[in-house]
Structure formats: C-alpha cells, structure tokens
Amino acid sequence: MRFDIITLFPEFFASPLSSGLMAKALARGIAEVVLTNPRHFSTDKHQRVDDEPYGGGVGMVMKPEPLFAAVESLPALPRREVIYVTPQGQPLTQQHLWHWSRERDQLVILCGHYEGVDERVVEHLVTQEISIGDFVLTCGEIPALVILNGVLRLLPGTVGKAASLHQDSFEDGLLDYPHYTRPAEFRGWTVPPVLLSGHHGEIAAWRRAQQIERTRQRRPDLYARWLARTQGQAKTH
C-alpha cells in the first residue's frame, strides 16, 4: 500500500517512520510512505504557500495551486483516497481504518496549516475529510500520523499475531477488557482469580462482561449504539 503525505514539514515524520512496527513494515515492503512538500510546487519566488483570506479575517489560508500541483504530481493508483485532516471532517473510527486497509491501494493525506486550505481544494481535490477529535492542533501532521499508524498496523504482516487485531477496543463496538500479567500480586493488589483459574469459558465470559461494563461507564455513547445493535440483531433471529 502506498501512503502519500502532503506536508510542509517532512522532517516531522522522520522519527516515527524509523522506529517500531512502522519501520519494520516499511522495511518489509508492506507499505511505502512518500513525503511531498507543497512548497516545491509554489510559483512564488519565496515559495509561499499561503495568503490572506478573501473577505478579511485573522490568519492565513493555504493556496490551492501548490496543493493541486503536489497531488497531481503523484501517481494515481486505481483505488486512491485523498484525505484532508480537519476538525470539520467525519470523526475517525476503527471502521475507517479497516475500510482503507482493505479497499484502498493509496492514501493521499493532506496536512493543513494556518486557518486551513482554500475551499476549492476540499471541493475538487479531496475525497474525504477526517477529524481525530473535537479539538484543534497546530498542524495536520499529527492526525496524518494517526491515520498512517492506524492503517499500517492493519495491513497483513505488520502485526505478528493478526488475531490480536480483532480483540482491540472498538472492533465489535466495545472497549477492551482489562489486561494483567505477572506477578499475580503487586503491592497487595491481586489479579482477578478467574484469570488464574485456567477455565477458558469463564475467562471469556469475565472479559466480555468487563468490556460491556467498562464501555457503559466510560463511553455511554458507544454503549448505547452497541446495545441498540445487539437488540436489533436479537429481534431478527
């Protein structure tokens, strides 16, 4: 799979791409990451990529010409998505990550800066707007890295035990269950006895109950959706 990151700061990605599972995945040829700086496509002698907004207002807006030129300079694979990371986008979910990992050959991720990009970029170049939360960051590189990491770990061969991917939080609409390891007792705090019992059925039931209760307490929005879906499935049987 190919990832194209359109960024004013390619150096931002140096450390993440050279460490951990992402570095191993790239070394194995599971994916390719190409960083493209839109400044290189500016026709301004000072390589400016931003200008003042029409209608007035604070801040600067990224110009359309360098962004269009940067994206159009890339090879276009048959199943390509052009993503703009912005607080105005759809909230990123695990379902987005799975969809891209299975249904796309190329992700082009546009990192915004300043007050954002010229709306013509969004209307005529971008195919999907994505937000990682209801907050504002200084740059689009951080959410771009979130998407890159989230999709990359789902590609076959990146994670050693592929089965573990389906036990993560959000895979079935619930949060993950608690995890414990040795020692069985630490500073007087003990591991739940059921996990030491060796009864796989009881362990599975305990973990499921923990998932449901944890989701109900911490993410009532997720719990409500899970409950509605579960009840709907029960009515169809």
Curated annotation (Swiss-Prot):
The record's Pfam families line, in alphabetical order, gives: tRNA_m1G_MT
One annotated GO biological process? tRNA N1-guanine methylation
Family annotation (InterPro entries):
Alpha/beta_knot_MTases, tRNA_m1G_MeTrfase_C_sf, tRNA_m1G_MeTrfase_TrmD, tRNA_m1G_MTases_N, tRNA_MeTrfase_TRMD/TRM10
Q: Does the keyword Metal-binding apply?
A: no
State a GO cellular component annotated for this protein: cytosol
Entry keyword set: Cytoplasm, Methyltransferase, S-adenosyl-L-methionine, Transferase, tRNA processing
- Give me the reactions it catalyses: guanosine(37) in tRNA + S-adenosyl-L-methionine = N(1)-methylguanosine(37) in tRNA + S-adenosyl-L-homocysteine + H(+)
Coarse class of the protein's main subcellular location: cytoplasm
Q: What Gene Ontology molecular function terms does this protein carry?
A: tRNA (guanine(37)-N1)-methyltransferase activity
Subunit-level organization: Homodimer.
Please describe what this protein does: Specifically methylates guanosine-37 in various tRNAs.
Q: Would you identify the family this protein belongs to, as annotated?
A: Belongs to the RNA methyltransferase TrmD family.
Its recorded name reads tRNA (guanine-N(1)-)-methyltransferase
| Naturally occurring in which organism (per UniProt) | Thermosynechococcus vestitus (strain NIES-2133 / IAM M-273 / BP-1)
Protein encoded by which gene:
trmD
